[in-house]
């Protein structure tokens, strides 16, 4: 998933120090046409990552909506210490307009306003 970011350092604090993801790749764009700063975070053995971009010739401000959600299914209680760590690293706890997410999880906005849902339900694609 790729998203624009206003501040890659703030995004890194939230996703890495807050959520516990790993920096997989980082690049500074420099002054070349089409170049931008890039931060990729995720789990080293996962088949997905978040690609956060900033700057470039045509910078794009983040434009999240209340339904732009990244949902993590924890298959158990949402640890309060995880929520506290996300809040301590730039997150904001918010209520979801969808009552399902309020019943089954905790929603936290990242520094760019995108929403992360920590859901206590389980999920499997198999």
Residue map of PLM features:
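Core segments of cupin and vicinal oxygen chelate
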Residues: 3-47
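Short amphipathic alpha-helices within nucleic acid-binding modules
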Residues: 14, 78-85
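Short hydrophobic/aromatic beta-strand element in the GNAT-like acyltransferase core
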Residues: 38-40, 71, 105-107
């Amino acid at each position: 998933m790729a998203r624009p970011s206003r501040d890659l350092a703030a995004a890194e604090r939230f996703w890495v120090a807050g959520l516990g993801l790993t920096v997989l790749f980082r690049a500074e764009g420099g002054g070349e046409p089409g170049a931008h700063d890039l931060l990729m975070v995720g789990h080293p053995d996962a088949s997905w990552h978040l690609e956060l971009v900033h700057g470039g010739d045509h910078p794009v401000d983040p434009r999240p909506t209340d339904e732009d959600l990244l949902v993590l299914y924890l298959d158990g209680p949402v640890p309060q210490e995880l929520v506290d760590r996300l809040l301590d690293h730039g997150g904001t706890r918010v209520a979801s307009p969808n009552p399902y997410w309020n019943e089954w999880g905790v929603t936290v906005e990242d520094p760019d306003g995108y929403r992360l849902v920590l859901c206590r339900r389980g999920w499997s694609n198999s």
